[in-house]
Amino acid sequence: MYAVIKTGGQQFKVKQGTILKIEKLEIEPGKKVTFKEVLIVSDGDDIQVGTPFVSKVTVEAKIISQGKGKKVHILKFRRRKHSMKQQGHRQLLTEIEIVKINA
C-alpha cells in the first residue's frame, strides 16, 4: 500500500516505514503529525485518485529530527567589472517516518 501526500508545496510517494526529509514543520521531535492532503492511495489493484484530495484518508508520521539541508552556493559574477557576489543557503528540514496510512 502506498500514498502520495502533499506537504510544503511538494508531493511525496510514501509507504509505511518510509523516512523523508520535508520542509520544516514547527513540531518537536518525537511527536506525531497527520497529513490530510492525500492525493492518491493505492492498495494493490485498488487505486483511489482524489479531486484534489482523497476524502477520509490520512497519513500518520512521527517526527525524527529537525535540521538543515546541504548548503547551496550562489555566485553572481559580472564579467569585465571586477565584481562578484557570493551567497549561501541551507534549507531547514524535518525528518519524518511514515507510521501508518489510514485508508
UniProtKB/Swiss-Prot annotation:
<keyword id="KW-0689">Ribosomal protein</keyword>
<dbReference type="InterPro" id="IPR018258">
    <property type="entry name" value="Ribosomal_bL21_CS"/>
</dbReference>
<dbReference type="GO" id="GO:1990904">
    <property type="term" value="C:ribonucleoprotein complex"/>
</dbReference>
<keyword id="KW-0694">RNA-binding</keyword>
<dbReference type="GO" id="GO:0005840">
    <property type="term" value="C:ribosome"/>
</dbReference>
<keyword id="KW-0687">Ribonucleoprotein</keyword>
<dbReference type="GO" id="GO:0006412">
    <property type="term" value="P:translation"/>
</dbReference>
<comment type="function">
    <text>This protein binds to 23S rRNA in the presence of protein L20.</text>
</comment>
<dbReference type="Pfam" id="PF00829">
    <property type="entry name" value="Ribosomal_L21p"/>
</dbReference>
<dbReference type="InterPro" id="IPR036164">
    <property type="entry name" value="bL21-like_sf"/>
</dbReference>
<dbReference type="GO" id="GO:0019843">
    <property type="term" value="F:rRNA binding"/>
</dbReference>
<dbReference type="GO" id="GO:0003735">
    <property type="term" value="F:structural constituent of ribosome"/>
</dbReference>
<comment type="subunit">
    <text>Part of the 50S ribosomal subunit. Contacts protein L20.</text>
</comment>
<dbReference type="InterPro" id="IPR001787">
    <property type="entry name" value="Ribosomal_bL21"/>
</dbReference>
<dbReference type="InterPro" id="IPR028909">
    <property type="entry name" value="bL21-like"/>
</dbReference>
<keyword id="KW-0699">rRNA-binding</keyword>
<dbReference type="GO" id="GO:0005737">
    <property type="term" value="C:cytoplasm"/>
</dbReference>
<protein>
    <recommendedName>
        <fullName>Large ribosomal subunit protein bL21</fullName>
    </recommendedName>
</protein>
<comment type="similarity">
    <text>Belongs to the bacterial ribosomal protein bL21 family.</text>
</comment>
